[in-house]
Amino acid sequence: MAERGSDIRPGQILDHNGSLYLVVKTMHTQPGKGGAYIQAELKNLKTGAKYQERFRSDGYVKRAIVEEVEYQYIFGDGASLTLMNTATYEQVSISADMLGEKGVYLKEGIILTLSFYQGQVVAARVPDYVVLEVVETESVIKGQTASSSYKSAVLENGERISVPPFIKVGERIVVYTVDDTYYERAKD
């Protein structure tokens, strides 16, 4: 399926130069001279190699036709992950490397989205938003509110992110996994 270059988004899978690529990051650039373009970081799904590619905003790219299916994470042994289809209860094992650095968000029961191309799993991704507990954070000092200030916090998965000063140890927060940032307090 052909798509305009300006419509490329992270998480999409492109059929480019005869190979499948996962779009990792995109940035729209409009230089003073010449046409606008999209600078994209692509990951080759076969080799795992990453590279930069420019696509004209008014040009077209071929998007791979993939089937996306939700699977529930059951367990992992470090090298592979065992997942269960939430509709058919069929189990599948995938390489832990498919999630890359986003594997830190894995916990029992989380729903992952697997992308199938011609019957093979070609990509896996965690949800855009996950709920995690704060296990360690700095204490806030009164009077530090002249400008928007954030403090460092360690989450239950060991990740360190910046959170607003009102967040305390033991609170559950929503993390935006696309850029690993605080989104809001969990409403549970």
Curated annotation (Swiss-Prot):
Record key words, sorted: Cytoplasm, Elongation factor, Protein biosynthesis
Protein name: Elongation factor P
A biological process from GO: peptide biosynthetic process
First-listed, main subcellular location of the protein, grouped into a coarse class: cytoplasm
Signal peptide: none
UniProt record similarity statement: Belongs to the elongation factor P family.
Primary role: Involved in peptide bond synthesis. Stimulates efficient translation and peptide-bond synthesis on native or reconstituted 70S ribosomes in vitro. Probably functions indirectly by altering the affinity of the ribosome for aminoacyl-tRNA, thus increasing their reactivity as acceptors for peptidyl transferase.
Domain of life: Bacteria
A cellular component term, taken from the record's GO annotations: cytoplasm
Organism: Anaplasma marginale (strain St. Maries)
Pfam families per record: EFP (PF01132), EFP_N (PF08207), Elong-fact-P_C (PF09285)
One Gene Ontology term of the molecular function aspect: translation elongation factor activity
CDD domains for this protein: S1_EF-P_repeat_2
Functional pathway: Protein biosynthesis; polypeptide chain elongation
Compartments it resides in: Cytoplasm
